[in-house]
């Protein structure tokens, strides 16, 4: 009650000030104005929405004398935190038009927003402008530019900027190095990231856990697991404790390469160091085991994570269900699906797609269609492609054609894969003429036949001993620059 009363008073005072205090340069009211805006920011702003922030900004622009740049910066900062970067840039420009000068803080806010919008040329011009007004870029300025360049995959521009700033006496800190190293790793420039790591060491900047995590993940993604393991040992020697992200990155690459004993040793080491494996760690282990057909061990890993108090998520179950279905053990996959529901987890489209495909591959089209009819999540084009292909492969082509006809009438956007499946199904039952009609209609539907379309149709003509048509189509495929499968 007291808080709402304060806000109400502030609101009424605000209206009063805008009506009565628009005259410029009244020395009597300057202290009162400063106290008023200070009180407004301290009592009201935490509950203000975007529209109210804009309204406040407009009132501040109209007030005389003007509030301080600090107060304007608070509004810009709040709007920037809501990710309305273009709006901040517009308001910043409006302040300049109104003759309101900026300080380093407000410049940094707009530079960050420009970088978030990938408007790097303008961001650099703002840096030049602020330097003309006597404001030297600080670590926040440079960090914003570096982060923007890295997010825009312009890592070399980020490195060049650091070099130029060093010439001006700026010393990059661990945050800036981490940003560039992480950006380099994410676009596959792992060697450059390692060179930068060595450079920061030479410059006396101590790497932290974030540095190592980025490098370890980058090395793992590029298949350099031995270098990643060496880096982890280096971490331990420097008393930088690897965290769950570090361990998980290396475990993930070990299991993908089939090095399960090494992965389990690392798992045991992380528990020994009191680093609790999280759902991502277990998901990596389960995924790796499933990739190599070791689904029973993957299921044991699920049981282990539950006993350790780590709750599986939809990804965990989707991975396991997919593993069992690929191993032609679809009933066990369905059992996991039911267990998933008992844990309060709702299967997504991927879950249903996996089970439907599993039943089709097991030669049980009726069970697949039953799962589809009970599907809770919205089917996607992948779902329908699985249905069409499964029906065709199980000699239910007529049902597939009915489904295809319904799909054409619906708002589902069909792709070339969908048409290829239907063309294949028609050819499978000897209905080559209808398949040919569908093939020829592709261009009218805005689709271009791919190598699968051509080879399926050529194969259909060959089965009907229509050699001239198959030969002409083969030549057309070559003219389109497609090589046969």
From Swiss-Prot:
The keyword Cytoplasm does not apply. Keywords: Repeat. One of its GO terms (cellular component) is mitochondrion. It holds the Pfam family PPR_2. It comes from the Eukaryota. The lineage of its organism: Eukaryota, Viridiplantae, Streptophyta, Embryophyta, Tracheophyta. PPR repeats lie at residues 68-102, 103-137, 138-172, 173-207, 208-242, 243-277, 278-312, 313-347, 348-378, 380-414, 415-449, 450-484. Belongs to the PPR family. P subfamily. Disulfide bonds: none annotated. This is Pentatricopeptide repeat-containing protein At1g62720. GO terms for biological process: seed germination. PANTHER family: OS04G0488500 PROTEIN, PENTATRICOPEPTIDE REPEAT-CONTAINING PROTEIN PET309, MITOCHONDRIAL.
């Amino acid at each position: 009650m007291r808080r709402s009363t304060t806000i109400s008073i502030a609101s009424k005072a605000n209206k009063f000030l805008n009506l009565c205090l628009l005259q410029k340069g009244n020395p009597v009211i300057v202290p009162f104005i400063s106290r008023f805006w200070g009180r407004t920011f301290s009592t009201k702003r935490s509950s203000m929405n975007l529209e109210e922030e804009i309204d406040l900004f407009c009132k501040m622009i109209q007030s005389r004398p003007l509030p301080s740049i600090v107060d304007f910066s608070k509004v810009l900062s709040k709007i920037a935190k809501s990710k309305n970067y273009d709006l901040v840039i517009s308001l910043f420009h409006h302040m300049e038009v109104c003759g309101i000068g900026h300080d380093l803080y407000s410049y940094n806010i707009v530079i960050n927003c420009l970088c978030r919008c990938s408007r790097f040329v303008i961001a650099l011009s703002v840096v030049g402008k602020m330097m003309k007004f006597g404001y030297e870029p600080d670590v926040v300025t440079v960090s914003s530019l570096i982060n923007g360049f890295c997010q825009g995959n312009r890592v070399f521009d980020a490195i060049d900027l650091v070099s130029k700033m060093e010439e001006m006496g700026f010393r990059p800190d661990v945050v800036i190095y981490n940003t560039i190293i992480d950006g380099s790793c994410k676009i596959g420039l792992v060697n450059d990231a390692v060179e930068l790591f060595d450079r920061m060491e030479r410059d006396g900047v101590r790497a932290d856990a974030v540095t190592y995590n980025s490098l370890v993940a980058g090395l793992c993604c590029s298949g350099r697991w031995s270098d990643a393991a060496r880096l982890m040992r280096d971490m331990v020697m420097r008393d930088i404790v690897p965290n769950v992200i570090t361990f998980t990155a290396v475990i993930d690459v070990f299991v993908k390469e089939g090095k399960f004993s090494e992965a389990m040793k690392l798992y045991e080491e992380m528990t020994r160091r009191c680093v609790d494996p999280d759902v991502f760690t277990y998901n990596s282990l389960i995924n790796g085991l499933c990739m190599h057909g070791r689904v029973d061990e993957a299921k044991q890993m699920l049981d282990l994570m539950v006993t350790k108090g780590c709750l599986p998520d939809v990804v965990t179950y989707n991975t396991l269900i997919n593993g069992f279905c690929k191993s032609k053990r679809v009933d066990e996959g369905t059992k996991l699906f039911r267990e998933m529901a008992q844990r309060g987890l709702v299967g997504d489209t991927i879950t249903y797609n996996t089970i439907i495909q599993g039943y089709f591959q097991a030669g049980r089209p009726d069970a697949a269609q039953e799962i589809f009819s009970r599907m809770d999540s919205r089917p996607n084009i992948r779902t329908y492609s699985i249905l069409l292909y499964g029906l065709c492969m199980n000699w239910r082509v007529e049902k597939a054609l009915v489904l295809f006809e319904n799909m054409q009438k619906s708002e589902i956007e069909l792709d070339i894969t969908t048409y290829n499946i239907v063309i294949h199904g028609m050819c499978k039952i000897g209905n080559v003429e209808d398949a040919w009609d569908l093939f020829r209609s592709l261009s009218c539907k805005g689709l271009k036949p791919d190598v699968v379309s051509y080879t399926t149709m050529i194969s259909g003509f060959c089965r009907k001993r229509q050699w001239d048509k198959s030969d002409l189509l083969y030549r057309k495929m070559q003219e389109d620059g497609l090589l046969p499968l």
